[in-house]
Structure formats: structure tokens, C-alpha cells
A protein has these predicted regions:
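PAS/PAS-like sensory domain cap-loop motif
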Residues: 66-78
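PAS/LOV and allied N-terminal sensory domains
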Residues: 63-66, 194-195
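Terminal output helix/cap of sensory domains in signal transduction proteins
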Residues: 76, 82-113
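Short loop/turn elements at sensory-signaling interfaces that couple input to output
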Residues: 118-141
Length: 196
């Protein structure tokens, strides 16, 4: 496989996974033959279908950065413990990937929550691309997982601070208001400069 022969895969600072979605494609073909047209609605009717598709995906290879990111000793350690990595409800994020692939798209992107093998939360940006020549059977899909935990933590902290500030105004036992004194300050600064 040309991608695996390239040092770029092994040396990439981004976690990369090569996965085989061909069993998912076979499931899609079966559902199409049964008359399914709106895959999103069909999957949401019974979310176990999403989980079933997830279990059909085979991890073929990962790069060293993937092992590092998920705190795995080796490929076997990682693949034997995928349930720990994907332990949260991933149906909503996985749904978007399945809909994209069902619609013939060769690129998809999501944010999701994964966990390292030692239990640390990872907020990730997942990007996937069906490699050229494999569009018909989805047998080779390149997935990257970028750790965006610091960014996500900052967003959560900002949201928490905003909610606390709003609550102080809404539930204060005394009257509170906000005034803009910037014009007063500008005038005082102007007078101070004139006095110097």
C-alpha cells in the first residue's frame, strides 16, 4: 500500500488511522435494496443501527502519533481497547459520518469526545477521506484525529464564566445595572493632558 510505504504516515504529527469501511458499504447496499432512502431518519429510528455500523469498521493500521495520543502501548493494545476510547455515546457524531458516506461524499469532518486508554478525556476533530480508488467499496479510509482539548476546555470555561456573569445579574438581591463610563474617562484623560 503506497500510503504505508511513505514516511509521511509514520512521521506525521497528527494521529492517523487507516480503516476499512467495506462492511459498512455492504450494509448500505442491503438497506438500499430494502428501499431505504433517507439514511439519517432510518438510523435515528433505531440508534442500534449506528452502533452496528461502527462495529463493522476495521482498523487496519495507525501511526505512532495515534498510539501516543491514545496512550496505547502498541497497535494490538489500541485495537483491543477501542471500547474504552469510544465509550461515550458517539451516535450523533458517527451519524454524520455515515450520512456523508451514504451520500457518496469522500470527505467528512466532526468533533467528538474520545478517551485515552488511561481514561483521560480527549476532545478531537476527526477528519476522514476515502482514498482514491476505494470509493466504490470504502475499503480504505484515512482518518485523522486532532486533539483540540485545550481549545474545547477554553470554550467550556468561557461559557461557564458567561453563565455566572448572567446569573449575577438575574438573581442579584439588589438592583444592578451596567453603565458605560468610557466618555467620562476620555473627558478626564483629556483634562489631565491639558493640565500637564
Amino acid at each position: 500500500m503506497q500510503l504505508l510505504d511513505s514516511p509521511i504516515f509514520e512521521l506525521s504529527p497528527i494521529a492517523m488511522w487507516l480503516e476499512d469501511f467495506s462492511e459498512v458499504q455492504k450494509q448500505f447496499d442491503l438497506w438500499r435494496s430494502e428501499g431505504v432512502e433517507d439514511i439519517a431518519s432510518f438510523l435515528l429510528e433505531d440508534k442500534s443501527r449506528i452502533l452496528s455500523c461502527a462495529h463493522k469498521i476495521k482498523v487496519l493500521h495507525v501511526n505512532p502519533q495515534t498510539l501516543k495520543q491514545f496512550e496505547a502501548q502498541n497497535f494490538e493494545d489500541l485495537t483491543a481497547n477501542l471500547a474504552q476510547i469510544f465509550k461515550a455515546d458517539m451516535s450523533s457524531t458517527h451519524l454524520n459520518e455515515l450520512v456523508a458516506l451514504w451520500n457518496g461524499e469522500t470527505l467528512f469532518e466532526n468533533t467528538a469526545v474520545n478517551y485515552t486508554l488511561t481514561g483521560h478525556r480527549l476532545d478531537i476533530r476527526l477528519r476522514g477521506t476515502v482514498l482514491p480508488g476505494h470509493e466504490h467499496d470504502l475499503s480504505l479510509v484515512l482518518i485523522t484525529t486532532e486533539d483540540i482539548t485545550p481549545y474545547a476546555n477554553a470554550q467550556r470555561l468561557e461559557e461557564k464564566s458567561r453563565l455566572i456573569a448572567e446569573a449575577r445579574f438575574q438573581y442579584s438581591p439588589t438592583s444592578l445595572w451596567v453603565e458605560d463610563f468610557s466618555r467620562v474617562k476620555a473627558r478626564l484623560d483629556h483634562l489631565r493632558r491639558l493640565g500637564d
